[in-house]
A protein has these predicted regions:
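Binuclear metal-ion centers of metallo-dependent hydrolases, dominated by the metallo-beta-lactamase
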Residues: 1-4, 77-92, 155, 165-209
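Structural motif
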Residues: 20-21, 40, 64, 125, ...
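Short amphipathic alpha-helical segments and helix-helix/interface helices
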Residues: 10, 51-55, 70, 154-158, ...
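Core dinuclear metal-dependent hydrolase active-site scaffold
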Residues: 1-34, 82-136, 147-153, 201-209
Length: 209
């Protein structure tokens, strides 16, 4: 299984010739949906979902997401499946389990649904939340930036989930100086936990089990 990081919050996972894309938002300029078999979308914010790109994608593309996103994709009948906390399903040869219900607290007047996804019991992508799935997580895609996130919360999340490896996501708001800070934070915590925590550059891949 190969994981490739793209702009901001988007990743692409490939296995046995099948392609699964997570959160291809408007910050994602790379053509990540080309050749994709399925898409997982954690929530409705534009940096995680680009409705126009989904509508222009292959009609065979399968989309799994929360009710909030599905409501914006009603003109794609049959392509969109609503997922809720506790659901389990298979798509494009990947086994997926759903965890969580809500976006981390951001604006008090705008609650937003958010679903995290565990893929093949290997990769956990929480979206814009610090959801603890309560299961072993070999690879965590950890949010490292955003108006709803503090450094202390990120570190505590890494220590609670305690993954064997973690890669930065939700880092598209940083300039080069900010990304350097992310690298330092992850390196420091990696040494503390004796684990592999780091940031992948846009287009960089990692081979997983």
């Amino acid at each position: 299984m190969e994981l490739t990081k793209y702009e901001h919050a988007c990743v692409r996972v490939e296995k046995n010739g099948k392609v699964l894309v997570i959160d291809p938002g408007t910050f994602t300029e790379s053509p990540v949906l080309d050749g994709a078999d399925a898409v997982l979308i954690t929530h409705e914010h534009w940096d995680h979902v680009d409705v126009d790109k989904l509508k222009a994608a292959s009609p065979a593309l399968e989309i799994y997401t929360c009710e909030g996103v599905a409501a914006a994709l009603t003109d794609l009948p049959g392509k969109v499946q609503v997922v809720r906390h506790g659901d389990a399903f298979e798509t494009a040869g990947f086994r997926v389990r759903a965890f969580g219900e809500w976006h981390a607290k951001n604006h008090p007047d705008v609650p937003v649904q958010n679903i995290g996804f565990l893929i093949d019991d290997e990769i956990f992508y929480p979206g814009d939340a610090l959801t603890v799935p309560g299961v072993e997580v070999p690879t965590l895609l950890v949010p490292t930036g955003g108006p709803w996130l503090k450094l202390g919360d990120m570190v505590e999340y890494l220590r609670t989930v305690h993954p064997g490896r973690a890669f930065s996501t939700h880092d598209g708001l940083y300039n080069d100086t900010g990304l350097g800070l992310v690298d330092t934070w992850l390196k420091t915590e990696s040494e503390t936990q004796n684990a592999d925590f780091r940031r992948l550059a846009v287009g960089e891949s990692a081979t997983l089990s």
